[in-house]
Amino acid sequence: MYVNHETALDDYPFKTQPYEHQRVALNKGAHREAYGYLMEMGTGKSKTLLDNIGILYLSGHVNFAVLFAPKGVYRNWVSKEIPEHFSDSIPHRTIRWVSSPNATQLKEIRSVAQPFEGMTFFVMNIEALSTVKGVEALTWLGKKFGAKGLIGVDESTTIKNMKAKRTKNLIKAGQLFAYRRILTGSPVTKAPLDIYAQAEFLGPRLLGHSSYYSFQGRYAVTQKRKMGAHSFEQVVGYRNLEELSGIISQFSYRVLKKDCLDLPEKVYTVREVELTPEQTKMYNEIRGEGLTLLDGGELVSTQSIIAQMLRLQQVLSGHLKTDDGDLVTFPTNRIEELVSICEEAGGKVIIWSRFRHDIQQITQRLKQEFGEDSAASYYGDTSDDERLRIVQDFQKPDHPLRFFVGNAATAGYGITLTEANTVVYFANSFDLEHRIQSEDRAHRLGQKNKVLYIDLISPGTIDERIVKALRQKIDLGAKVLGEEAREWLRLDPKRMK
């Protein structure tokens, strides 16, 4: 049964009512075989895709969807997006891919082969498509369910490289599915050539070119460079971008926060970050020590409890200061998730962390990724003259300084940073006043856009309680006492594995 666009939206049992721009997106793309939701971060791409899937299910077109996202955040679809936004009126199940599953996880993965009267979601990390096992799984899913299936890629700039193994594998397997979707907030004009591979995943020659080199020749300005005995064409600029945008608009919908009139002035969201094995091990050791001290009556003051929480929070950021003052570091996914956010953000970004080591590492990584002049740090070590220069440069719309990396205790008061409409909390302060004041650096007189606030959270850790408390305007210094501290320390990251 085919349901036309208007009937689908009028009759669809939304779990959460869509904003007007989401209705426009669904009207344009819900029934297209290949479509892109190129919606700026904070405008609700995930909900739009889930409503799209529900509409196709009720139309009789799909009963299976495989969704891809980067490894650090793909579980967010399982724990947050699908439960919060997919219609309760549609029976559904969600199965998560794990590359090295235990017995319980393997049983869950294999359950996909069992008949199910309803909608099945199969969630995978995009990195799995660089492995034989992941490609074989997707190919099997496509052959079995693809005729009434949808394949979607969240943060689709992860497949921008046509030479990458994962991109080639996804394009090939994607054609087994009746419907294909991409989700990204990255503006096409920032890196126009990145759209080619994403469009090829949606369908061959959607951009009107049979090869990447033909596409590059039309839209890029190149110069021949020599490196030793080798010569190559280096991209030095772009052309015909208005034409390219017009072509892309035929199979996608683009919207910016500033154009979403019914969005609230402040939009809050979280990005989940998976702990590395090293972080999980150290986190559990420290929380075990804390519970032992609590049970023995040794943790009696607010200050000693907060000190224990602080050690846990350091581990979540990928480092720990020992009792001797030495700094120990751990592998972490948090900085790479931040880089993904910064890639997707259209304009300038404020990044807050309470830790000096974070600020230094973040600034260094962003400079490495986006250029030496792209990031600046504002914390205790920053001189007064440098602080003034950083704020002035950041507030200039055309200045290359895009990322303000600061400590809320130092930079959260008095300064104006309204050129940014994206604010990321890498590691929150426990101080409620620091949170309130740091939010207001972007949201104050002079801000012309909606402001998106993103908290990085590792599931099953104190991150969850910290963010919940701060958003409820609870000052943590007076809150985490007695049984409250015990409950925080009982949180187990392993429960999310």
Regions found by a protein language model. Name each.
Residues 1-2, 30-31, 42-70, 129, ...:
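Conserved Helicase C-terminal RecA-like lobe
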Residues 63-64, 79, 84-85, 89-95, ...:
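Conserved P-loop NTPase motor "coupling/switch" region that bridges the ATPase
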Residues 104-122, 385-402:
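Conserved motor-coupling elements within RecA-like helicase/translocase cores
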Residues 104-120, 127-147:
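Conserved helix/coil segment N-terminal to the catalytic DExD/H
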Residues 130-134, 190-192, 359-363, 388, ...:
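SF2 helicase motor core recognition
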Residues 154-155:
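Walker B catalytic acidic pair
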Residues 430-497:
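A conserved SF2-helicase RecA2
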